Amino acid sequence: LTFHGTMEGEIETLRKLLHYYKGNLNSRLLYITGPDSLYEDTTGKTLMVRSAEEFCRQYGELHQIAVKILRVPYLYSGTYEEDYFFKLFSTVINKKQITFEEAPAQEMHFLALSDLGDLLYKIFDNWGEGSACLQVPQVFHFTFQQFGERLAQMFPAANITYLSDVLIRDGISDDHVLRNEYGWFPKISLLEDLTEIYEDYCEKTNHKTRKIDV
């Protein structure tokens, strides 16, 4: 669920997990996945995500396991070493250089862990009958260029560039299901949370400086 993350062993892990629940008619499984299956372009990762979702559906139907699929924007952390932002902060501090693999106009699709935690509580508290596919909408509309401008304020010596000729992907549209059925919507914007993420990173890595020297 991390941006630019991998899915190594995902299908096999799902198979083992679902096999464990086979035969238990009261089992409930919530499979949380990223937005990749909704993208119009086809890549190796989008194919893997779609396959994992379909595997959950088919296995659940075959063995009568209540499966819900929750598609969310990418998660972020300042303390998880494999996270996109942990690596980004390390790069900008050590190299004073960031090259985004996205176009400046590409919107960023991210969700705060605390927002996800609130949603999970509401889903399990009001599970309902049958299987379903739920989608966390993209409600904070800001681009990589705006994000880069925010980073430039934090790291004034950093050189920030973008790939201008890449495909721009749309975010998850709001079907209002989560708001109407669970009374939930994302509350925390990544841009507002960025300073705290960086402080978490500094605490994790014992990095004392809050800004790159000019």
Regions found by a protein language model. Give the residues of each.
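Active-site beta-alpha turn of Rossmann-fold NAD(P)-dependent dehydrogenases/reductases
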Residues: 30-34, 71-73, 137
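Short-chain dehydrogenase/reductase
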Residues: 7-11, 41-53, 83-86, 109-110, ...
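C-terminal substrate-binding subdomain of Rossmann-fold SDR/epimerase-dehydratase oxidoreductases
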Residues: 100-103, 109-214
